Design a protein with these regions (language model features):
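Outer-membrane beta-barrel transmembrane domain signature
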Residues: 129-250, 273-275
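Transmembrane beta-strand segments that form the barrel wall of outer-membrane beta-barrel proteins
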Residues: 22-31, 50-66, 87-100, 128-135, ...
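Residues that define the transmembrane beta-barrel architecture of outer-membrane proteins
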Residues: 33-39, 70-72, 104-110, 146-152, ...
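Outer-membrane beta-barrel domain signature
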Residues: 26-32, 63-67, 99-105, 141-147, ...
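Repeated loop/turn-to-beta-strand initiation elements of outer-membrane beta-barrel proteins
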Residues: 47-56, 85-90, 121-125, 164-168, ...
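Hydrophobic/aromatic-rich structural module bridging two neighboring secondary-structure elements via a short loop
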Residues: 68-123
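Outer-membrane beta-barrel "beta-signal"
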Residues: 114, 259-275
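Residue-level signature of outer-membrane beta-barrel architecture
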Residues: 45-47, 80, 92, 116-118, ...
Length: 275
């Protein structure tokens, strides 16, 4: 009897909807597989006290099947060992991105993280939680995206110290959550204009937009020189909101919401010199 009542209520609710009511639908854009490379070099300085580490790093990234210089990173950071098993860190980056449509554009990023670790024989396990904010240094349509995007990254990593070897293989999995994306749940359909009204913009949409898998090995070239050789695979999901500059869906009939999917697979080399 209870199931019948629920079904009757659902049917009545559906019949109560106005005929021709507009429903916000999502299109899909599957970008397929893209390949590229990541190359970086940096300096890691153990300060006084020895619990403090300072780091400077430069990185270049290639995409479009190794055919385009996509991003340039300049980063500085610091980590402090709070306990034998817990570290806290801060960092900042200047990011220059090569966009197909708009050329080179700059962003700045700042973040804070906590990393806990434990060891079992020659195995080492760590969990890192990183909160970051990325601000675009160019004009954006705020009905489509937030000028400053907040994200939370959660990473689990395992590594193994091979006896009498210069190599230390590892594997890591990371989830990235967007924390303040434009929420389309507040969009309303304007019957007189025949368009969606997106002017009630609220930045409170939270969803996972990237899953990253990385595996590789650290190679101790010398006492103070380390080379990281790795492969990285990113599965990306991003909600693209296409509105005009006045906050309404476009008259051309282009889809307002598109879920853009894609997979990136890349090779990486990262060199660190320790002072």
């Amino acid at each position: 009897m209870r199931i019948r009542r629920l079904l009757s209520f659902a049917a009545a609710a559906l019949l109560a909807l106005p005929v021709g009511a507009q429903v916000l639908t999502y299109g899909t854009d599957d970008g397929g597989l893209e390949t590229g490379a990541r190359l970086s070099g940096g300096v890691d300085w153990t300060a006084i006290p020895k619990k403090l580490h300072l780091k400077w790093d430069e990185e270049v990234r290639f995409d479009s099947d190794f055919g385009r210089l996509h991003k340039l990173y300049s980063s500085v950071g610091a980590t402090y060992r709070l306990t034998p098993w817990l570290r806290a860190g801060v960092y900042g980056s200047l990011i220059n991105t090569n966009s197909t449509d708009n050329g080179w554009r700059n962003r700045v990023r700042a973040g804070f993280d906590l990393q806990g670790s434990m060891e079992a024989d020659r195995w080492k396990f760590s969990l890192r939680e990183r909160l970051q904010a990325t601000t675009k240094l160019y004009d954006v349509n705020t009905y489509q995206e937030n000028a400053t995007a907040w994200a939370l990254k959660s990473r689990i990593k395992a590594s193994y110290d091979i006896p009498h070897s210069r190599f230390e293989p590892y594997a890591a999995v990371e989830l990235r959550n967007t924390l303040n994306a434009v929420n389309p749940a507040y969009f309303k359909y304007n019957k007189s204009l025949g368009r969606w009204d997106c002017t009630d913009t609220r930045y409170d949409d939270i969803y996972i937009n990237r899953l990253r898998f990385q595996a590789g090995t650290g190679w101790k070239l010398a006492r103070k020189q380390l080379l990281d050789i790795f492969v990285v695979v990113d599965s990306n999901w991003n909600l693209d909101i296409d509105t005009s500059s006045n906050g309404y869906s476009r008259a051309s009939g282009a889809p307002l919401l598109t879920l853009k999917k894609g997979v990136f697979a890349g090779l990486g080399l990262s060199f660190t010199f320790k002072l």
